[in-house]
Amino acid sequence: MHQVIQLKILDSRIGDTIPLPAYATDGSAGLDLRVCISEPMQVAPQQAVLLPTGIAIYIADPKLAAVILPRSGLGHKNGIVLGNLVGLIDSDYQGELKISCWNRSQEHFTVNPGDRIAQLVFIPVVQASFEVVNEFTESSRGEGGFGSSGRY
């Protein structure tokens, strides 16, 4: 599936010294988001910072949204994860994409201009309506949760 999304460049370095968001491989689900800062920045242990990307997107289609997700290598190797775990970008949002970066490690982490720090994935959206009921139609699971379907 291919969808054209409007992208606004908010910082002139984007597309020049800092590449536009791009898929790293043909099979990548997420576009790499890069940090748009002027100089290297230290993120202290347990510190959370909001990092600019220098871009804004407008999805427009209410059947689509985007999520900002962490890059697996940064979390596993460096303890760098998203402070909000997942960033949800609604179809009508038009502001700058920012990355909430949390250093959960015990070491300082340096973020350099143009570093790939997160990824952007587009997802389908179902806008649901509710039917208020007194009882649910019975299912095999019922109210079982938190491990009720098996240990692993």
From Swiss-Prot:
Pfam families assigned: dUTPase
Cited InterPro entries: dUTPase, dUTPase-like, dUTPase-like_sf, dUTPase_trimeric
Reactions catalysed according to its record: dUTP + H2O = dUMP + diphosphate + H(+)
Signal sequence annotation: none
Entry keywords, A to Z: Hydrolase, Magnesium, Metal-binding, Nucleotide metabolism
Residues where substrate binds: 71-73, 84, 88-90, 98
Annotated pathway: Pyrimidine metabolism; dUMP biosynthesis; dUMP from dCTP (dUTP route): step 2/2
Disulfide pairings: none
Cytoplasm found in the keyword field: no
EC number: 3.6.1.23
Class of this enzyme: hydrolase
GO BP: dUMP biosynthetic process; dUTP catabolic process
Needed co-factor(s): Mg(2+)
PANTHER family: DEOXYURIDINE 5'-TRIPHOSPHATE NUCLEOTIDOHYDROLASE (PTHR11241:SF0)
Similarity comment: Belongs to the dUTPase family.
Role summary: This enzyme is involved in nucleotide metabolism: it produces dUMP, the immediate precursor of thymidine nucleotides and it decreases the intracellular concentration of dUTP so that uracil cannot be incorporated into DNA.
Protein name: Deoxyuridine 5'-triphosphate nucleotidohydrolase
